[in-house]
A protein has these predicted regions:
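Non-catalytic accessory segments flanking enzyme active sites
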Residues: 1, 25-27, 41, 50-55, ...
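Short, conserved, GDST-rich strand-edge loop motifs in beta-rich repeat architectures
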Residues: 1-22, 68-70, 163-165
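Short, solvent-exposed loop/turn segments at conserved positions within beta-propeller repeat blades
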Residues: 20-24, 70-74, 119-124, 165-170, ...
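Beta-propeller blade signature
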Residues: 26-33, 78-85, 128-131, 174-177, ...
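A short helix->beta-strand "capping" segment at the edge of beta-propeller domains
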Residues: 33-43
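Short coil/turn segments that connect the beta-strands within blades of beta-propeller domains
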Residues: 59-61, 111-112, 155-157, 201
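Large, well-folded core regions of big proteins
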Residues: 89, 99, 106-118, 128
């Protein structure tokens, strides 16, 4: 591979396992900046499994380690203690077709559980799990896909997401509360993408359709009111 930002390009060689070749063996280790000790988290990563994501939960003594097999239809998530190395399986999903690894970055660890987006019912939907990995409820459901999970307000137990429930060629922004009451937040028909403030009181929305170039606005969540236009590409 040739790359570089300098006057002359450099050459870098790395292993890329092609079909039929063995995957590299991987392992997870924690390092103490105080004692300078290294400890291996001996989670099962055998055969054709690899580690697509490692992240801390809201508990500083709890590391989430995620594994996928090469076929990407068996997903495991372990909770491991970086001090002791003790781990336990917290979530496992087997799909006869495919587990979308892109959704793993959308897992949110809450004070009392975590969220997980899965296609286990045939469509991409948001699920809420307990701290021990027991599914508490399916947050969204229907014959349509959640296309982006935008966050959850733990104070109000409200979930925010983007979906294609109106049409496969449109994207809209919604919120849904603990009782399952759903509210559409985007007001324009077409493609909407939103980024919410930390307290979910406001969101920046990027909207476009076949006849409208991208328009970026700041909106108030409660009233859906457009507060300010950040960018308008209209002629």
């Amino acid at each position: 591979q040739m790359y570089g930002e300098g006057l002359y390009p450099g050459y870098y060689e790395y292993k890329y396992p092609k079909a039929g070749q063995k995957n590299s063996k991987v392992s997870v280790h924690s390092y103490s900046v105080v004692t300078k000790d290294t400890k291996e988290m001996k989670v099962p990563v055998e055969g054709d499994f690899y580690i697509p994501r490692i992240t801390f939960t809201q508990n500083p003594d709890q590391l989430a380690i995620m594994t996928l097999n090469r076929q990407q239809n068996v997903f495991n998530m372990y909770y491991a203690n970086p001090k002791s190395g003790v781990f336990r399986l917290i979530l496992r999903e087997e799909n006869k077709c495919y587990v979308d690894s892109d959704w793993l970055t959308s897992i949110q660890f809450l004070n009392n559980g975590f969220t997980y987006v899965s296609e286990q019912d045939g469509y991409s939907h948001i699920y809420l799990y307990s701290p021990t990995g027991v599914m508490q409820r399916q947050v969204t459901q229907g014959n349509w896909d959640v296309t982006a999970f935008l966050g959850v307000d733990e104070n109000t137990k409200t979930f925010y997401y983007e979906s294609a429930e109106e049409s496969p060629i449109r994207r809209s922004i919604y919120k849904i509360d603990a009782k399952g009451v759903k509210t559409k937040l985007s007001t324009e028909e077409g493609m909407n993408k939103a980024v919410f403030s930390d307290n979910f009181a406001y969101f920046v929305n990027t909207y476009s359709n076949a006849n409208t170039p991208a328009k970026i606005t700041v909106n108030e969540t409660k009233t859906k009111k457009e507060l300010r236009v950040l960018q308008d590409n209209a002629a």
